[in-house]
A protein has these predicted regions:
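Hydrophobic alpha-helical transmembrane segments of multi-pass membrane transport proteins
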Residues: 38-41, 181-261
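Cytoplasmic juxtamembrane interface segments
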Residues: 120-137, 182, 213, 291-313
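Alpha-helical membrane-protein architecture signal
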Residues: 8, 12-16, 192, 231-232, ...
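Membrane-spanning alpha-helical segments of multipass transporters and channels
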Residues: 64, 248, 252, 256-260, ...
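Extracytoplasmic/periplasmic domains immediately adjacent to an N-terminal transmembrane anchor
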Residues: 1-190, 385, 392-393
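Alpha-helical segments in transporter systems
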Residues: 28, 32, 245, 363-364
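Residues that define the loop-to-transmembrane-helix transition and helix capping
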Residues: 26-27, 236, 302
Length: 393
């Protein structure tokens, strides 16, 4: 009984020591509170309109007829496209694209109206700058739709001239009507698409780096032995006492972004907020344990921080929210399971978007639990580094 009491006392003393270190170093305040809050506000306000609006586009109207002017007005009416300039030739429009003044231009050839009425199949061209993927894709979609509508309008006029009724003309032009229903994000809101994974990913990256730094700086400042002595030479008590205050702070930040996204901004959350808060707690604990593995594998502050930043940044690319994992190379598909953010993303899809029960995501919760068990493989190596390793500047 006394032995257990001594362990609790040692744990409390280590926690008090770590709390004093947290409040005495502004770096901790910045990385654990200020940086996450800044990222929350930055990403959500950066894409507050959901989709980019009025992307600058140009028009080269060589026909200058009532038909071509009507096409330009209709193109400008699309919410994502804003016609900001008219050019006299393709060369000037191309130069404007290269200079970044516009993201694309719509080319209407001379004689469009006359050739359309005489059924000589005039060609409409449009050019978009795919160096900017989102802007180029949105402009391409609008310009392609405008081209199809123009072709349909010309064909409908010909059918009307031949005596077809409106129903007959529309049945010929569009024999199959497509009714689209985007699931989970029907507004096609980029903020919903990105922020639900970017914000937890940034928090995970900061947890990696703060965990590695808080342990590595003990080696650098040669206070590791004092830390171990305070924990009765138990590496488990030492790590628990050091990281529990971090867990509390990061979990509070996690609760805050969940309330902010799903309560204040009303992002889709079909299973309720509590499963997402639990998933956030699992992500925080898994990220801390990964940080222990990183500094235990490379017990040098420089190498440990490099490992943490590299692993954290790769997580954004391989987690599957920007490019589907199923379309990746099979090797990368397997490697994606080595990143906690990947499993959090799958939980988010199941819980928040699809509204499934937590039992449906049991494999992802088990994966995060396995991440929490990983420090047991490096604790003895880490303890040796804390006792014997000498930091070389």
């Amino acid at each position: 009984m006394k032995e257990r009491k001594k362990k609790y006392v040692a744990l409390w003393q280590v926690m008090q020591r770590e709390c004093r270190r947290l409040v005495s170093r502004p770096l901790y305040l910045f990385c654990m509170v200020i940086a996450p809050l800044f990222c929350y506000l930055f990403f959500t306000t950066l894409m507050d309109s959901g989709l980019p609006q009025n992307l600058p586009a140009g028009v080269v109207d060589m026909d200058d007829s009532s038909t071509s002017r009507n096409i330009v007005r209709n193109l400008d009416a699309f919410s994502q496209t804003g016609v900001v300039a008219h050019y006299s030739n393709v060369t000037d429009a191309r130069i404007a694209v290269q200079e970044g003044k516009i993201y694309g231009f719509f080319y209407i050839p001379k004689g469009l109206s006359a050739e359309a009425q005489s059924q000589r199949q005039p060609k409409i061209s449009f050019y978009t700058n795919y160096s900017y993927l989102i802007a180029g894709s949105l402009l391409f979609r609008d310009m392609k739709m405008m081209g199809e509508l123009t072709a349909g309008s010309a064909a409908r006029s010909v059918l009307y001239a031949k005596g077809a009724t409106e129903d007959q003309a529309m049945g010929f032009l569009q024999p199959i009507v497509i009714d689209t229903h985007p699931l989970n994000n029907p507004w096609l809101n980029y903020s919903v698409y990105l922020c639900n994974t970017l914000i937890p990913g940034v928090l995970m990256l900061l947890i990696f780096m703060v965990t590695v730094y808080s342990i590595g700086v003990e080696i650098k400042d040669r206070t590791a032995r004092e830390w171990l002595r305070m924990s009765n030479n138990s590496i488990y008590i030492a790590l628990a006492g050091k990281l529990l205050p971090h867990t509390v702070v990061f979990f509070i930040m996690g609760i805050f972004y969940n309330v902010y996204l799903y309560g204040f901004l009303h992002f889709p959350c079909n299973s309720g907020i509590f499963p997402m808060i639990f998933a956030t707690l699992c992500l925080v604990l898994a990220s801390q344990c990964c940080g222990i593995v990183m500094i235990g594998t490379l017990p040098t502050l420089r190498l440990g921080l490099s490992f943490a930043s590299l692993w954290g940044v790769i997580s954004f690319s391989i987690s599957g929210f920007s490019f589907p994992v199923m379309a990746m190379n099979p090797v990368l598909q397997a490697l994606s399971n080595l990143f906690p953010l990947r499993h959090y993303f799958l939980i988010y899809v199941d819980q928040a978007l699809n509204g499934y029960s937590m039992a449906y995501s049991w494999s992802n919760y088990m994966a995060l639990l396995i991440f929490m068990m990983l420090p047991f493989s490096v604790v003895h190596r880490l303890k040796e580094a804390l006792v014997y390793y000498k930091y070389i500047p």
